Amino acid sequence: MSPRGLPAPPDDLPELPTTKLGQKPLWRIHPADVDPWFFDLGPDGRFNLAESGTCCLAEEPIGAFVEKFGRLLRPGGVIPEPLVDAQRLSSLRPPKASVVDLTDATVLGLIGLTAEIHSTSDYDLTQGWALALQEAGYGGIRYKARHDPRGELVSIAVFGSGKAPRSVAKAASIPVDLIHEASATFAITVLPRHHSRRR
C-alpha cells in the first residue's frame, strides 16, 4: 500500500459509528426474474462476502437507479429501453441490524478510511474490509454511491446471515418519474425501444 492508498483493516477494530436498519424501507433495482433479496457471493461486488454474500440496496430510488445503470451507460449517457423494461424496482424492509456508517467523517481518524473506500476498483481490499466488519459483529455497511459524482446518494450493503429476510418486497416496473429524475439529475437518457432496434 502506498502512503496515500486505502489501508487494509487493522487486526483490532475500534468501536465505529453505526446506523440502525429496520425503520425505513430501502430500494433495489434487479432483473424481473431474480429475487430482490439476492446475496451476491461473487468477486465483482464492492463489499461482497464470499461465504454468506452481500445484498446492496439504496436509501432512495434514484440511488438504486444510478448504481444499477450507471455502469451500463452507452456513449452519450444512453440506456436502451429494453434493458430498463427488464428490471424491477423493489422496496424492501431490511432486517433490524447495526451497520457501520462509512459516510461518517470520524472513520478517517478512527481507522484511516478516506472517500476512496466508496470508489476504488480494488475489490479485494474492500471485500477484506467487509469481512473484517462482519467478523466484528456488524450487519453491513453504509457508504456513498459510487456513480453519484456529487457524493450525496447513499447505499447500504447488508451482509448475509444464512437466513432469508422475512420482509416481503414490493416490486414494480421502473416508474416514469424515476426515469425523468435520472435524466434531470444525471443526464441519463433511456433510448426508446424503436431507436434501440435501429442500432
Which ranges hold each PLM region?
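Active-site and NAD+-binding cores of ADP-ribose-processing enzymes
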Residues: 1-42, 46, 75-199
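Extended catalytic/binding region for NAD+/ADP-ribose chemistry, centered on the ART fold
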Residues: 46-75
